[in-house]
């Protein structure tokens, strides 16, 4: 199976929920938002979430795994990524976003952490 992202829920009022599968060693993200916020919940595998404030440079990291379910908040103005730290297992992450993607007003800006 290739890396994948599948939208599970899509509502104009409450945003969207998707499931994301990352192969071993893969980094995803490397972007930030003006108004969107997201929650990343790793349900299987072992990964690292990195966030960096685009104005101050302050950086935070969260080691995450399916063995310890927790929600990590991606806040506006912080570029973020998620890295699969495993050499053998997929990283499975439930991702929620408070807004749906609007192609006429995109709110995703590439910037490495």
Model features per residue range: what roles?
Residues 7-8, 28-34, 41, 62-64, ...:
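Short histidine-centered beta-strand/loop micro-motifs
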Residues 29-31, 49-51, 71-74, 80-87:
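Short beta-strand His + acidic residue motifs that chelate non-heme Fe in jelly-roll/DSBH
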């Amino acid at each position: 199976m290739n890396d994948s992202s599948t939208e599970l829920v899509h509502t104009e009022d409450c945003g969207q929920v998707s499931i994301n599968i990352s192969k071993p060693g893969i980094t995803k993200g490397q972007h930030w938002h003006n108004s969107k916020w997201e929650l990343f919940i790793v349900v299987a595998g072992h990964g690292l979430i990195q966030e960096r404030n685009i104005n101050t440079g302050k950086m935070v990291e969260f080691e995450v795994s399916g063995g310890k379910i927790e929600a990590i908040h991606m806040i506006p103005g912080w570029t973020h990524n998620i890295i699969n730290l495993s050499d053998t297992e997929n990283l499975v992450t439930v991702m929620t976003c408070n807004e749906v993607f609007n192609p006429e007003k995109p709110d995703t800006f590439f910037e490495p952490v």
